[in-house]
Amino acid sequence: MATRGSRSEKVKRIFQQFDGNHDGGLNREEMAALVVAVNPRVKFSDEQINAILDEVFRTYAEFIDPNKGLTYDGLLRTYDDGAGDVDRDFDALGLELNADETTIKGSEAASSSSITDERAVEAQKKQRTAAWAVSPNHGIVFDETWKLVDDLEILVKRLKSKQEKDGKLKADNNNNNVDAFSDAGWSRELGPSSEISEKRIYWEESSHDYGVFVKELGVLRSKADGARSREEAFDGHMAIGRVLYEHQLFKEALVSFKRACELQPTDVRPHFKAGNCLYVLGKCKESKDEFLLALEAAESGGNQWAYLLPQIYVNLGIALEGEGMVLSACEYYREAAILCPTHFRALKLLGSALFGVGEYRAAVKALEEAIYLKPDYADAHCDLASSLHSMGEDERAIEVFQRAIDLKPGHVDALYNLGGLYMDLGRFQRASEMYTRVLTVWPNHWRAQLNKAVSLLGAGETEEAKRALKEALKLTNRVELHDAISHLKHLQKKKGKNNGNGNGGEGPFIVVEPSKFKTVGEKTTLRPDLATALQIRAFQRVTRLGKCDVEAVRKEMRDNDVPVSYSGSGGPTKSIRKPNLEEILRRLLSSLKPDTFQGAIKAINEKILALLDDSGSGRVDMGMFYAVIAPLCGGHSDKRKRVAFDALLWRPVNEGSSQITKTDAVKYIKLLRAIYIPSHGMSEMLEVHGEEEAESSVTVTFNQFLAMFDDPDWGFGIMSTILKLEANDRNRHGNQVCSVCRYPVIGSRFKEVKARFSLCNQCYGEGKVPPSFKQEEYKFREYESEAEAMKAKCVCFSMQSHKKAIAT
């Protein structure tokens, strides 16, 4: 990392390169030439250039000379604010920094003893603490503050020495290469954004030495409070906080920044720094609140804090992502990129967040822009490759993943995701190589160990797969690992049996057409119904909507009304923007962890919001949304249907009535089918528009709505099968395994009454049967539990014994 001195010299060389008339300022033409020259890969239009220049000259108005343009100090400020990468621009322009230039000022100073003494003191100040302290924008203002900083540095050094001696100071050793992960683009300082490449340090806070340190730190804080003015006290607490932050004493730094907030509530800097501390401490909600206060202060402070807005937006977005609020984070990343078009981290974060909510095309566009601005950005390459893979552009994705790995050979995310891509393509040997490289960087990555086992199994290396599974079991005791080991044992037994007679070269299963699957008994689910219900149940489990009581949806409608707006068609609706909808979902799914909630939002955005926002306006009809999610929420089925009906009543067109229009009812049912049964529903959606006019005056009662809803052919009759899955899909059937996939049967067991083999839910729904049981048709009986199967067996034995008695 460049020192402050070399950094400023580089900026000066760049400034001189484009100050063509040597008047000490960069006019619009000179600035335009600079922007184009440092972005050789970007083809700017005249409109884009003018927009960038307008933004620069407006944001940095205090550094604009009316007759000359942007001054050197102004250009330095733009780089300090993260608007560009000094090192990258310097290299792109082919400039060189002479070593002698940094020492000229020192030699000139020797001509005057008094000046020499003064400059020597300043130089010592610069050397004894971090570069931020001497920054003209955010540095130390009062001389007394320097004394506090000096004393604090001594205290920290003493604490570090004692804890290192006692072996109490711990670095984060969970992995061997922290820098191998995709960075968050975290703007740590009120200056240039920088990646956190050093390891996290954990201080032993319960030790006696730490207690003494905190006590002595309290004395320094008291000195800061006893300053001659409020401004000097603020300066002292900010400096103390920043020194503590640099040494990763985040809890203590937070105390200082909070005190600085009390002294100057309208200053952006302490709120920003407090937000950073809270985020590092894992308190994302409190971090978000501090950044919102910083944003409020910056927006009300006029141009004084305008240059900080992009970084506040970026860190606010990161804090929101920490809560799982990815749609909201996208909004702030987008704002940062608009304010600062060369902010490559904002563009990368925007692309990554868009990928996280399933908007892959938009993600690719943002990530490609980030890479144009920073071609060696490994993390952007990694997420771009993941987006391309999600769009089906696998060969290009492999190339981009490889580029990310070339840029950063130990990049865990790129290696792991490339392994997953190779698995999807059936290239198991290459996949196992990628997972092996992940484990080289991060030895206790249990998912990589498990996936390595699966890829080795796919490559036919059963013994190696078994060893890899055992290694994974040492790292975690998750139940799926036990199932996988059991699965391997069954495969080995089957392989041993087949060595004698074989299957005639056939695969592990054959797929039978649906008409050949017959059911025995009224309770046995039809194969097509189960296949559809399994897909809906999978969506329900990913979104965790089953954890949301449907009464909470009713309460949300009652307590938080949505203002009426008018859509493009002119009809009144209660619609809100997607980020606001995300806030409502966060309340409904408040028990979810952030990463789980993020997965839920992605699934809902892809499956539901994409259809509800078919115009691409970014707004969603909330009445229709509540009605669509109600059938999958928790609670009795009758309550779910009632809430769905009430949600349609809540829409402006039906409000105040006890009945809904038939248009709404038909549209809802067809939308429900289009979302959850897409193979049937999409064509039906096209018919709705032609029916609206004729049915707009016809109303539907709740009982009529129920009849429409429960219709097995034209309604959502599949819900009865979904309810059965909800009740039984965690049931285990003892030692019973599926005859096709060889995994333990979980959920219902489907037993073929003639051949007597058993299938799990998934294989039955997909129509898979063992190749050794070829029949003209298959008759299945469904058992929801093993107790039910035993009961049926006892009844069968009883009937047989009666028959024998009669025969004799």
Swiss-Prot record:
Residue ranges the record marks as coiled coil: 773-794
Give the Gene Ontology MF terms in alphabetical order.
Answer: calcium ion binding
Write out the GO cellular component annotations: endosome; extracellular region; Golgi apparatus; plasma membrane; plasmodesma; trans-Golgi network
Q: Does the keyword Coiled coil apply?
A: yes
Q: Where are the TPR repeats?
A: 234-267, 269-301, 310-343, 344-377, 378-411, 412-445, 447-479
**SMART domains associated with the record:** TPR (SM00028)
What Pfam families does the annotation carry? Answer: TPR_16
**UniProt KW keywords:** Coiled coil, Metal-binding, Repeat, TPR repeat
Q: Where is the EF-hand domain?
A: 6-41, 600-635
Designated name of the protein? Uncharacterized TPR repeat-containing protein At1g05150
